[in-house]
Amino acid sequence: LTTDAMEAIETCQVIVELVGGTTFAKTIILEALKRGKPVVTANKALLAKYGEELFAEAEKSGADIFYEASVGGGIPIIKSLREGLVGNRINRIYGILNGTCNYILTRMERDQADFKEVLADAQKLGYAEANPSLDIDGFDTAHKATIAASLAYGKWFGMDPVYVEGITEITLDEIKLTKELGYKIKLLAIIKQNDGNVEIRVHPTLIPKQSMLAKVDDVFNAVMVNGDFVGDTLFYGRGAGRNATASAVVADITDVCLNLNAGSSRRLPGFVAGNLYDQVLPIDNVRSRYYLSLQVADEPGVLAKITNILASYNISISSVVQKERKGGENVSLVILTHLCEEKDMKAAIVRINALEEVRNNVKFIRIEDL
């Protein structure tokens, strides 16, 4: 045994990096790869940020990087994308990839509790960190989404073009309203091919409550992958925790040993470059359906003004729900739209917010009809 990482790199056949962070961990991995040593890592933040550099070094030296534990913990999604689904062109991936967020949203719905109350409980139970921002602001999920997208499409996209939005603005009222409309709110990683480009985005999303992903509750994770031959596949399990991580790490070590025994000519690489798609589509150019909620004056003609604004941006309405007024002069209005570009929706919302009869800024949540 040694406490010197460089000594371990020199003497060990396989390097397992579990120290975390993006500085010292990067040094360890690069030094190991330069010496032709295979690496196993669970470091999602490092791979999301420096994956292109690390795998370029691995290709140069003929070494391998295995990283099953970086996405989905004990769910074998990396191996499935790399091997089991290799005969498919991946059309889309939907993922519930953060147990903390999924636990919070599940408890808010089940116990009719607000966000801050459930977050405090999650911290007491060890499901959330003392500083939970990486989880609840969506960046943990975004790291995982970037890795999965890069593997699926053969190009390291990095974090910069990925749209990230967390769950901190989700209210109990919205969870109740969307449930009445037949939806559940999940923090969803969305990866899609789109006319030569790729969508990689993370945000709260309304999904039909009868869908398989809507039934994934508490700290569990799930990934739905659609391939052109296989259709929809679903991977479900524990996405974090020492046992789930250990399971994935040991599986990677086993694959490394198989590669070492097979020899370099028959090894299975950890990443194969394909460059099938050019770039990540900006969020403003993404087409989606939307849920809009707002408070308006209980006066004739208000809805007509709102629908006229939406129509001027070619946004058509799927349904409108007006909640019964309980005292006061305002009513709650919920609008579901058909597909439209996000830039058009944002422009329409600016004009709707400027109406004298609108009492609060419009809140919107994207919808995915899985």
Identify what each model region corresponds to.
Residues 248, 253-370:
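A conserved regulatory-domain signal marking ACT and ACT-like small-molecule sensing domains
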Residues 3, 49, 72, 76, ...:
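Conserved active-site and cofactor/substrate-binding residues in soluble primary-metabolism enzymes
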Residues 92-94, 102-105, 121, 126-131, ...:
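Catalytic, metal-anchored helix/loop core of enzyme active sites in primary metabolism
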Residues 117-215, 220-222:
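Substrate-binding/catalytic subdomain of NAD(P)-dependent oxidoreductase enzymes
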Residues 1-24:
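A structured beta-alpha segment of the ubiquitous adenosine-cofactor-binding alpha/beta core
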Residues 38-40, 317:
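A short hydrophobic/small-residue beta-strand
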Residues 59-140, 147:
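Rossmann-like NAD(P)H-binding beta-loop-alpha module
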Residues 19-35, 42-83:
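Rossmann-fold NAD(P)-binding glycine/threonine-rich loop
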